[in-house]
């Protein structure tokens, strides 16, 4: 499903446009810190003026097609927001040895570059951990991308979802650990996002906001997945903490069917159709 390209200059980020269309324990819930106040619009505009408005390619072989018109392109990641769910449809990022940084703080903020009605504020998570046993889970990971120039945007709630603690601190973080280790020697392109296949619960302090039923992640190394070095995973929100992420490998086609997205949108159709129906060979590099 292709949509008309429509790029609009953002405030503290590079672009907002229509797109043809979570490390070690860093992902673990931390005590909530006081939300910062976004700088006023003129200050953000001045920041933009000081930086060349160049789009970073965080997708490698085309960003997913079939999401919304709210696409944010940042140094750390590219994100497509869903104003209905209040979470991203997908988040894509490029991880390398130089993109990593440890010890980055978690200061949760509402995304200043989305309409306030289309994303969550920190108060939305009040009481969620106690009531639902969920953490604030990064989609683009903080440790793996903390070396980015705009790493603070990793803590914007547009990049966060309420993820069960057993998943966030279990199979999901172990996959992130392997992803980060792999990026020490190779460029890793990843796209990830939530699933809403059944009703589980709503955030207690955000009426009507459903928590995702699961998550998906697709990774490839090098310049293209066409050489077979890719892997895709789907993990249910209720995945036990001790589960092995290797047991949740799927095909890219399965993820496309569940999400309605077209992944790797710039790949030639004949190549895409072939590899998307396969599980790929990257899982062995991830310890599977």
Labelled PLM ranges:
Residues 21-89, 95-96, 269-288:
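N-terminal module-boundary/linker segments of secreted carbohydrate-active enzymes
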Residues 17-18:
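C-terminal motif of bacterial Sec signal peptides marking the signal peptidase cleavage site
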Residues 71-136:
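Short, His- and charge-rich active-site/binding loops that engage polyanionic ligands
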Residues 116-288:
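Domain-level detector of nuclease and nuclease-like folds
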Residues 4-13:
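Sec-dependent signal peptide recognition
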Residues 9, 59-64, 197-204:
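Short Pro/Gly-enriched beta-strand edge/turn motifs at strand-loop
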Residues 23, 98-99, 221-223:
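Short regulatory "switch" loops immediately downstream of catalytic or recognition motifs
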């Amino acid at each position: 499903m292709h949509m008309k390209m429509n790029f609009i200059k953002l405030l503290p980020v590079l672009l907002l446009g229509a797109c043809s269309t979570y490390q070690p324990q860093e992902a673990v819930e931390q005590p909530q810190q006081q939300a910062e106040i976004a700088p006023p619009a003129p200050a953000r505009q001045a920041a933009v003026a000081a930086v060349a408005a160049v789009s970073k390619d965080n997708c490698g072989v085309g960003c997913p097609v079939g999401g919304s018109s709210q696409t944010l392109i940042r140094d750390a990641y590219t994100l497509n927001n869903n104003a209905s769910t209040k979470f991203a449809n997908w988040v894509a990022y490029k991880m390398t040895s130089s993109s990593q940084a440890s010890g980055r703080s978690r200061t949760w903020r509402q995304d200043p570059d989305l309409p306030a009605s289309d994303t969550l504020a920190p108060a939305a998570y009040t009481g969620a951990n106690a009531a639902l046993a969920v953490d604030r889970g990064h989609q683009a990971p903080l440790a793996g991308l903390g070396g980015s120039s705009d790493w603070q945007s990793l803590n914007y709630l547009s990049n966060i979802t309420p993820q069960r603690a057993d998943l966030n601190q279990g199979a999901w973080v172990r996959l992130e650990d392997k992803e980060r280790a792999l990026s020490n020697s190779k460029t890793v392109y990843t796209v990830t996002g939530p699933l809403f296949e059944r009703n589980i619960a709503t955030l207690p302090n955000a009426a009507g906001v459903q928590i995702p039923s699961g998550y998906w992640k697709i990774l490839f190394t090098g310049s293209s997945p066409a050489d077979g070095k890719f892997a895709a995973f789907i993990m249910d929100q209720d995945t036990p903490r001790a589960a092995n992420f290797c047991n949740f490998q799927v095909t890219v086609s399965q993820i496309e069917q569940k999400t309605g997205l077209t992944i790797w949108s710039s790949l030639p159709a004949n190549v895409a159709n072939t590899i998307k129906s396969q599980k790929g060979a990257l899982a062995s590099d991830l310890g599977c």
